[in-house]
């Protein structure tokens, strides 16, 4: 168990390709309005930032964090030779490798650096079904939780002696035996890790006490569960959740608004919870999506694009705009898309080196230019 308060990273994947232009809205730009006759947002719609850019109207809670200087907006984020396939683009973001197929994820490699001896099977926790590739790495255990309230291998076994006896039983059942092959031994190790992780995480729910009332939707529930684990102080450093789908080929005005309303409100509740528990400076949140959308609408939505926007939020974040806002001029477009102007791995490198205190080069494969959105000291 880890008693001291440590820095942690929460990664929220905006699955499907978030429309950057209707998130950070260039509402005074004529090209924006001309290109999006059906889905543009006007000056009276947006939450103004600086007289030319505005947040989507449903991002009110994020705007409050922005006003406290706790939101970094990473404009024009992407990678060389953009790929408009959901699967390939997400794979690139997950593995931090844009030129070849990498075997493991950037966060999986990060977990390996944090805990090379696998002493803590809950160093990283995914909230949701399955395991995102970003968290995958050989011999690295990661717990995956659907609902913390019902999570646990033995939720109905309450007595200490009973639980210890049950854990010993499962340990013998999953433990390695002489003469078994490597695959069975690996499965056994994963079984023991899952068993221990389930038992540790199940305790976080009972310890939680807060006056914050979260909404009842998947992203709010996930962030509430993340808060529970943070406050339990069990040594978890990496948290992962997903929100979507942002694949708004049709019905974008309604769907995009609903998604950002849910996420913005959930983040507002999450940071109020952190502040109530004195942890607002210990947690940094990354929001990312695999790509942006095309500059022109298609009638009621937008198709897959390239350059996008990411966000870094937290009490230790130096808020503001980072990366150049992509031009909408025809000569600056990439086949009808906004041009990317900063590599997403620069954001990863900043979070690794400046926030988690981990050398980013072994994880990302080389040096990347870094931002200054993490406060010093």
Where are these regions (language model features)?
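Feature for exported/extracytoplasmic and membrane-associated proteins, marking the mature portion
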Residues: 1-277, 296, 309, 313-377
């Amino acid at each position: 168990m880890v008693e001291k308060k440590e820095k942690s990273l929460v990664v929220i994947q905006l699955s499907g390709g978030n429309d950057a232009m209707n998130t950070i809205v260039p509402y005074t730009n004529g090209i924006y309005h001309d290109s999006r006759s059906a889905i543009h947002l006007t000056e009276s719609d947006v939450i103004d930032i600086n007289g030319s850019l505005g947040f989507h109207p449903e991002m009110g809670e994020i705007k409050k964090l922005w006003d406290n200087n706790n939101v970094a907006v990473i404009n024009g984020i992407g990678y060389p030779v953009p790929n408009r396939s959901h699967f390939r683009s997400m794979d690139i973001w997950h593995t931090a490798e844009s030129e070849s197929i990498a075997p493991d994820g950037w966060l999986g490699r990060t977990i390996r650096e944090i805990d090379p001896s696998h002493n803590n099977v809950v160093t990283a926790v995914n909230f949701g079904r399955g395991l995102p590739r970003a968290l995958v790495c050989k011999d690295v255990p990661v717990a995956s939780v659907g609902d913390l309230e019902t999570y646990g291998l033995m939720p109905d076994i309450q007595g200490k002696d009973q639980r210890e006896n049950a854990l010993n039983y499962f340990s013998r059942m999953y433990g390695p035996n002489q003469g078994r092959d490597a695959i069975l031994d690996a499965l056994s190790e994963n079984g023991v890790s899952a068993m221990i992780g389930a038992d540790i995480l199940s305790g976080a729910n009972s310890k939680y006490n807060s006056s914050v009332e979260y909404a009842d939707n998947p992203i709010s529930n996930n962030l509430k569960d993340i808060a529970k684990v943070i406050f339990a102080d069990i040594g978890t450093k990496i948290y992962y959740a997903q929100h979507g789908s942002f694949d708004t080929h049709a019905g974008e005005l309604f769907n995009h608004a609903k998604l950002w309303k849910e996420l913005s409100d959930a983040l507002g509740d999450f940071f109020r919870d952190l502040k109530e528990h004195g942890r607002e400076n210990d947690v940094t949140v990354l929001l990312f999506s695999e790509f942006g959308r095309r500059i022109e609408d298609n009638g009621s939505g937008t198709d897959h694009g390239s350059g996008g926007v990411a966000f870094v939020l937290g009490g230790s974040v130096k808020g503001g705009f980072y990366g150049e806002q992509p031009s909408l001029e025809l000569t600056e477009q990439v086949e009808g898309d906004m041009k990317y102007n900063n590599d997403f791995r620069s954001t990863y490198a900043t979070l690794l080196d400046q926030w988690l205190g981990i050398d980013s080069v072994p994880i990302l494969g080389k040096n990347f230019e870094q931002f200054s959105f993490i406060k010093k000291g």
